[in-house]
A protein has these predicted regions:
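Interdomain hinge/lid region at the active-site interface
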Residues: 213-270
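NAD(P)+-binding Rossmann beta1-loop-alpha1 motif at the extreme N-terminus of oxidoreductases
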Residues: 1-54
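Rossmann-like NAD(P)(H) cofactor-binding subdomain of soluble oxidoreductases
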Residues: 44-124
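Conserved small/polar residues in nucleotide/adenosyl-binding loops
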Residues: 283-291
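Short, hydrophobic beta-strand segments that form beta-sheet elements in well-ordered domains
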Residues: 27-31, 88-91, 134-137
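Short, charged/polar "capping" segments at the starts of alpha-helices
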Residues: 35-39, 96-99, 141-144
Length: 291
């Protein structure tokens, strides 16, 4: 099957190159104006057009690689064309194929195909993207045809139920976006110790990267180290005493989570006293300030 794209952003351009690299036929990419195409992109062998009709005519599968809040708008435009028998896909992690409202009446088949990957730019290394999970949700009757198309790529591909999309996307956000917030709070604590931003991130990098690699090597339970794993309540209390209320909330919530892992690892140890310390810190946070 031949693939076309609407949207020449980071995801669209990266998938375009990646599909070509994996011998999937790509017809081109629609962009509203040629001015949206950078000089670097013009030097590549990508085909860009300002005609949706041309892309649709040449393509069996159309990827709407546009921001989430633009998918329904672009779809409303696409479905005014004759698209019977075509596969219409978007790449949103949070939205399901249902965002392609009324697709059954057009005779086309709707899918959400999401690469679980942080696209940093329009050029993504093939070997990096090859490690990403692709999730597929949508029309069951023609699912095998989409799976066959994607099987040209070396990625692991899984089917998702539409009702699981929000949890699936939340998992991705926990591992990616929220991890940024967590590192930012760690950086701010080092800022308070006199580190500038660069020095703070350089200090945190080997710790964070090594620990993250360890998690994926041995699993979350066996990767756990630190005061919670050692049942070191005094150190936990010192941390809570030293940080502001906003960071206490983060620290307490995540410490409760890793206590679950510690309890699995050390079933004969009671963590009730540590949980009590955390509960007290949260009670103090929720208490109104008295005049």
């Amino acid at each position: 099957m031949k693939v076309g794209f609407i949207g020449a952003g980071k995801v669209g351009c990266s998938l375009y190159d990646y599909f070509v690299h994996n011998n999937i036929l790509v017809t081109g990419c629609y962009t509203r104006t040629q001015a949206n195409v950078s000089g670097t992109e013009k030097q590549t062998q990508k085909i860009f057009t300002t005609s949706i009709d041309k892309i649709l005519t040449k393509s069996d599968v159309l990827f709407l690689t546009v921001p989430d809040d633009a998918i329904s708008t672009v779809w409303e435009q696409v479905k005014t064309y004759p698209i019977q028998g075509k596969f219409i896909c978007h790449c949103s992690g949070s939205l399901g194929s249902a965002v392609l409202s009324g697709i059954e009446a057009t005779g086309a088949y709707g899918y959400s195909i999401h690469p679980m990957f942080p696209f940093k730019g329009k050029k993504t290394a093939y070997e990096d993207l090859a490690q990403a999970l692709f999730s597929v949700e949508g029309n069951e009757e023609h699912m095998e045809e989409i799976m066959d198309l994607l099987s040209a790529c070396p990625n692991r591909i899984v089917r998702l139920k539409s009702e699981d999309k929000p949890k699936y996307h939340a998992a991705a956000v926990f591992a990616s976006n929220l991890a940024v917030g967590l590192i930012n709070q760690a950086k701010e604590l080092l800022n308070e110790c006199g580190f500038d931003d660069e020095a703070a991130l350089n200090a945190l990098k080997p710790l964070a990267v090594t620990n993250m690699n360890n998690i994926f090597d041995v699993g979350t339970c066996d990767a756990l180290t630190g005061p919670v794993e050692r049942h070191d309540i005094k150190t936990v209390q010192k941390h809570l005493d030293a940080i502001d209320q906003e960071k206490k909330e983060t620290y307490s919530a995540l410490t409760k989570e890793i206590i679950k892992l510690a309890e699995t690892r050390h079933p004969d140890t009671s963590y009730a006293d540590m949980k009590h310390v955390l509960e007290l810190s949260l009670i103090h946070i929720s208490e109104p300030t008295r005049p």
